[in-house]
UniProtKB/Swiss-Prot annotation:
GO terms for molecular function: IMP cyclohydrolase activity; phosphoribosylaminoimidazolecarboxamide formyltransferase activity. Pathway: Purine metabolism; IMP biosynthesis via de novo pathway; 5-formamido-1-(5-phospho-D-ribosyl)imidazole-4-carboxamide from 5-amino-1-(5-phospho-D-ribosyl)imidazole-4-carboxamide (10-formyl THF route): step 1/1; Purine metabolism; IMP biosynthesis via de novo pathway; IMP from 5-formamido-1-(5-phospho-D-ribosyl)imidazole-4-carboxamide: step 1/1. Keywords: Hydrolase, Multifunctional enzyme, Purine biosynthesis, Transferase. The lineage of its organism: Bacteria, Pseudomonadati, Pseudomonadota, Betaproteobacteria, Burkholderiales. GO terms for biological process: 'de novo' IMP biosynthetic process. Signal peptide: none annotated. The keyword Transcription regulation does not apply. This is Bifunctional purine biosynthesis protein PurH. One of its GO terms (cellular component) is cytosol. It comes from the Bacteria. The IMP cyclohydrolase activity resides in the N-terminal region.
């Protein structure tokens, strides 16, 4: 039974109402510093920890709760007579509920003007110590680190005569250990990223020790293949507009491959300003287009490769309306992603309950790092977020691209970034015409992209081509020109650039260099 609570919080969200409810249930309140003042100002009967222990706060508040009367009351096992006798001998009441959250270390170091001294002062000592004590003794002590749990605790207390069951205490304790581990991980990441010991310490992008924190969203039916197990975890600091922030409106449970492909589709479609549609199959775009509206964009994207679009993942950067929904509903689709779905669109898909509808608010946030596991290690890199501006492009051929060709080239370049290397993408009039992906030789990607367009009945005459990396030989260029391309965009940087540029001049096409490579593996 909870008779006494100690409350000390930095995040004061909902704390006054929570404390008032505890007081109304007859719980004695202990508190520290600013929290105690807040509760007292609200008219609640609260005892300062300094008065409770008979020992004042000291060292600018660094020592407040580090006292046997606090930790003895938390750590004592109620089922051990010798523990309870020790409390009685030293006049230490039990503390049955601990409500603590920590100094805002992560928010502090996120500030541009944060100094090492600022960071050090925001490393909480007493808070984690109390939290770990209470979590260790969770059989007898309820510990709350998240304001979202206030209502849960109150409801259970009211239903059980101020008592909290073991299942709830265990869940809350595991939450505490996860929280303190993440907190210490953030401190380690910060301190090991410092490149000097000056007050205004510069920071390395990559700390000497890297701690990552994710919360499990759900277990998945299986992994990439049915014999593999899997789960989906969410970054605690998932950026705005990230896939992990999805809300599923209908459909079957998401699979591992659904989530991976949905991320590829969503990241690509977000880069367009005009209404756009991206169709993904096995993490590769098989159709991308912009249009007057979502239905128009979908119709154009679907034309690129109707065969591969079967059972694909489709993403829009505009609300899906009834017209777009009716067009998409004619095909077999695994997942449909958009910022929103109109009521009429949702009604269309109500007849297809297996289709997964994911709603994600648009946002320009990105993951801090791109991660890839290797045997016994982890590769960490910055995101490939480099967007080439038209002013940065360098025309290296005798012929300049026309204004229309330049638009097509920029569109093709944007798409090529999301195609697995080696990537060759034919485009024209705001849509993909042929996509060659994932081949070991660039010339084979060029051939496949051309064949794909032929199979779809699309002409490549006057098309633009993007290559995610340089042409190592002229053979790939010869293939795309033979297919009908009149302009090419590529990074350049090959030992044979001069030979490739000469071939472009020989064919009378325009070639533009970006100076940026977009390998994707």
């Amino acid at each position: 039974m909870i008779k006494q609570a100690l409350i000390s919080v930095s995040d004061k969200t909902g704390i006054v109402d929570f404390a008032k409810s505890l007081s109304d249930l007859g719980v004695k309140l202990l508190s520290t510093g600013g929290t105690a003042k807040l509760l007292a100002d609200a008219g609640l009967p609260v005892t300062e920890v300094a008065d409770y222990t008979g020992f004042p706060e000291m060292l600018d508040g660094r020592v407040k709760t580090l006292h046997p009367k606090v930790h003895g009351g938390i750590l004592a096992r109620r089922d051990l007579p010798e523990h309870m006798q020790a409390l009685e001998q030293h006049d230490i009441p039990t503390i049955d509920l601990l409500v603590v959250n920590l100094y805002p270390f992560v928010a502090t170091i996120a500030k541009d003007d944060c100094t090492l001294a600022d960071a050090i002062e925001n490393i909480d000592i007493g808070g984690p110590t109390m939290l770990r004590s209470a979590a260790k003794n969770h059989r007898d002590v309820t510990v709350v680190v998240d304001p979202a749990d206030y209502a849960v605790v109150l409801d259970e207390m009211k239903a059980n005569g101020n008592a909290i069951g073991y299942a709830t205490n265990f869940r809350l304790a595991t939450k505490v250990f996860a929280h303190t581990a993440q907190y210490d991980g953030a401190i380690t990441n910060y301190l090991t990223s410092l490149t000097d010991e000056l007050q205004h310490a510069s920071r390395s992008t990559y700390p000497a020790t890297l701690n990552l924190a994710f919360d499990k969203v759900q277990d998945l039916r299986y992994g990439e293949n049915p014999h593999q197990s899997a789960a989906f975890y969410r970054d605690l600091a998932a950026p705005a507009g990230a896939l992990a922030n999805y809300r599923q409106l209908q459909g079957k449970e998401l699979s591992y491959n659904n989530i991976a492909d949905s991320d590829a589709a969503w990241e690509c479609v977000k880069t367009f300003d005009a209404p756009a549609c991206v169709i993904i199959k096995h993490a590769n775009p098989c159709g991308v287009a912009v249009g007057n509206d979502p239905a128009d964009a979908y119709a154009k994207a679907f034309q690129t490769d109707p065969t591969s679009a079967f059972g694909g993942i489709i993403a829009f950067n505009r609300e899906v309306d009834e017209a777009a929904a009716q067009a998409v509903a004619k095909q077999f689709v695994e997942v449909l992603i958009a910022p929103s779905f109109s009521a009429a669109a949702q009604q269309v898909f109500a007849a297809k309950q297996n289709v997964r509808l994911l709603e994600i608010a648009l946002g320009d946030g990105h993951n801090a790092f791109d991660l890839k596991r290797v045997g016994g290690g982890l590769l960490v890199q910055s995101l490939d977020s480099r967007n080439v501006q038209p002013s940065e492009l360098r025309v290296v051929t005798k012929r300049q691209p026309s204004a229309k060709e330049m638009d097509d080239l920029l569109f093709a370049w944007r798409v090529a970034k999301y195609v697995k290397s080696n990537a060759i993408v034919f485009c024209g009039n705001g849509m993909t015409l042929g996509v060659g992906a994932g081949q070991m030789s660039r010339v084979d990607s060029a051939r496949i992209a051309s064949i794909k367009a032929q199979n779809a009945g699309l002409t490549l005459a006057g098309s633009a081509v993007a290559s995610d990396a340089f042409f190592p030989f002229r053979d790939g260029l010869d293939v795309v020109v033979a297919a009908g391309a009149t302009c090419v965009i590529q990074p350049g940087g090959s030992m044979r650039d001069d030979e490739v540029i000469a071939a472009a001049d020989e064919h009378g096409i325009a070639m533009v260099l970006t100076g940026v490579r977009h390998f994707r593996h």
